[in-house]
Structure formats: structure tokens, C-alpha cells
Amino acid sequence: MKQYAKVTPEGSRDLLFEECDDRRRVENALTGLYEANGYRKVITPTLEFFDVFNSGDAGLDADEMYKLTDNRGRTTVLRPDNTLPIARLVATRLSEDAFPVRLYYNQSVFVRTKELAGRTDEVAQSGIELIGDGSMAADIQVITLAFSGALNRVAGV
């Protein structure tokens, strides 16, 4: 028998029944909140080029990323953050669209945790990006939606 055929790697876990239902309820509540405020859903690839995240000001530790090499020798990573891939998407796919652009996502990020302390390396994230509006009203909207989303989570939605 293979040694690791029946276990998950450290930092990962299976989700069953109630946990799946809870996650879906939260995601649906947040999706409703985002869409009611004019945000549109995007999904970025789970696998991105390392270069997307390899800038000194990104605030990401390269040692905490899951790195892979593709069949052409290029370094790729499992998505450790959602904001940078969305910035890439806007710059490459939506640059001709009218701004501001309101986007949301519900997808996992993958970061190696040096000390697991009960945390997993795959974390479900939900969030919004308001791109192209530097006004205070835009900042207030983003903060208000984040606060509303957190209240929904605390309320058990």
C-alpha cells in the first residue's frame, strides 16, 4: 500500500456536509451583497506565473508560496493572493472597459504556513476590488461592504 494514499498533506483537509453547507451559505450571502452593489464575479486561474507575485512591494513571502515548474521550465505558483491576479486580469482583459470596474471573487488561496497552529494552507477567500475610482466615496463603499460581510459572518449567515 502507498504510504500517503489515505491521508491529506499537512495544512490541508477534507470538508464534509455541514461545513460545505456553511461555506455555501456564507458565499451566497456575500455574493448577494456584492451583486446588489454592482460587483461582477470573476475567477482567476488557481495556477499563476510566479512573476505575478514576485515584486518587492507585494507583501508576499516567496518561501510561503507553493511553486511548480511547468513543462517549459517556467515557475508557476498556486494562487497565494487574489488581488494581484485580478489586477493582472484588469490590465490584460478589461483595459478597454469603462472604469471604475467592480469585481468580486469567491476562491481559494494557497500559502504555506510555517507554523500550522491549526490553520490550513488552503484558505477560502471572498472579496471585492473596486478599480479605477480613487474617491473617498469608493473607499467608504469598500469598507462598508467589508463590514457588512463581516457582520453577516458573525451572525452565522
Predicted region positions:
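TRNA-recognition modules of translation machinery and tRNA-sensing kinases, especially anticodon-binding
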Residues: 1-157
